[in-house]
């Protein structure tokens, strides 16, 4: 009887489509609101990716989900603050959010306007300047801008 009860009460990810998003948010101390769950599901239920607030807003619209740009922007920054995303500033007018939060570097493909991860081990950083007194390096981040070869 107990085996039958266990079998009947099992839940799977297919039965609970937001289970992973809810757990991800709770693990970092964020309340799983409807907007956060929708954004977490889109951002984290798949391969690592780079998004902007605008590209995410377009994706949300195509999925017939109503979330304001301001809420998307605020949520991206909340996710960054708790370590779920990494903010990558390409220039003063272009910020991307990366779901891969490990230390790694990027190509910025200028023609396409997108980021691409540089494979591990493809970039070696040699001599670094001295750190100001009382400071230490926290991270070295390289973004290589790539233009069309004409």
Model regions and ranges:
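Amphipathic alpha-helical interaction segments
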Residues: 38-41, 55, 74
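Basic amphipathic alpha-helical segments that dock to polyanions
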Residues: 72-82
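DNA-recognition alpha helix
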Residues: 52-64
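Short capping segments at the starts of secondary-structure elements
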Residues: 46-51
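Intrinsically disordered, low-complexity serine/threonine- and proline-rich regulatory segments
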Residues: 1-45
